């Protein structure tokens, strides 16, 4: 499975604290080696669409949509923002 990011993700990533950016890069490296690695806590977060989340660090998540063999990461942020995003996606 390949991984890509969109512009929205890039902008959100750039606004993260440096420590979280480092952790996100480490999570990405883990994902490249094994998307099902337990530390990523990969889970499907939408009933109808192939939308998944992974854990970046305690209190931080990334969200993407699976399109064929590509995971398109479109969001990254704090867990509080993640909860709000999921509420919007599930409407």
Regions found by a protein language model. Name each.
Residues 1-27:
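Arg/Lys-rich, positively charged N-terminal/basic patches that mediate binding to nucleic acids
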Residues 11, 35-40, 77-80:
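Residue-level signal for pocket-adjacent positions within structured domains
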Residues 12-16, 46, 60-68:
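Short, charged low-complexity linear motifs
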Residues 29-54:
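A short, surface-exposed loop/turn module that caps and links secondary-structure elements
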Residues 22-24, 44, 56, 62:
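Hydrophobic alpha-helical segments, especially transmembrane helices
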Residues 10, 28-31, 73-75:
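Tryptophan-centered motif/residue detector
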Residues 2-4, 56-91:
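Enriched for short, Lys/Arg-rich terminal
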């Amino acid at each position: 499975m390949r991984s890509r990011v969109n512009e929205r993700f890039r902008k959100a990533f750039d606004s993260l604290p440096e420590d979280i950016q480092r952790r996100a890069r480490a999570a990405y490296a883990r994902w490249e080696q094994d998307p099902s690695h337990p530390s990523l806590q990969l889970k499907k977060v939408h009933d109808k669409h192939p939308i998944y989340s992974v854990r970046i660090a305690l209190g931080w998540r990334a969200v993407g949509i699976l399109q064929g063999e590509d995971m398109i990461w479109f969001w990254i942020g704090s867990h509080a923002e993640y909860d709000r995003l999921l509420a919007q996606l599930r409407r």
